[in-house]
């Protein structure tokens, strides 16, 4: 049985992209997904580190919060 809600989603619902900026002090960054830039907060990084390097390849789920599309359930790819 899955332990996280995002592990229940099909692979078609997950997307991949690259971290294009991240401010460690604020905890905010952006992921580029084919020209579409999505905001994310460090609490969405699933490994719990709350930090990520620019240029890191990631998979994620797109969610809408307060009318803004954001990246959620962010997994760092090897």
Locations of the language-model features?
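Short boundary/loop segments of OB/S1/cold-shock single-stranded nucleic-acid-binding domains
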Residues: 1-15, 76-78
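Short, mixed charged/polar active-site loops
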Residues: 14, 37, 69
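Short aromatic-glycine-enriched beta-strand elements
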Residues: 25-30
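Short strand-coil-strand connectors
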Residues: 32-34
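A short macromolecule-binding patch
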Residues: 36-44
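Short nucleic-acid-contacting surface segments enriched for D/E, G, S/T with interspersed K/R
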Residues: 46-59
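OB-fold/S1-family single-stranded nucleic acid-binding modules
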Residues: 63-78
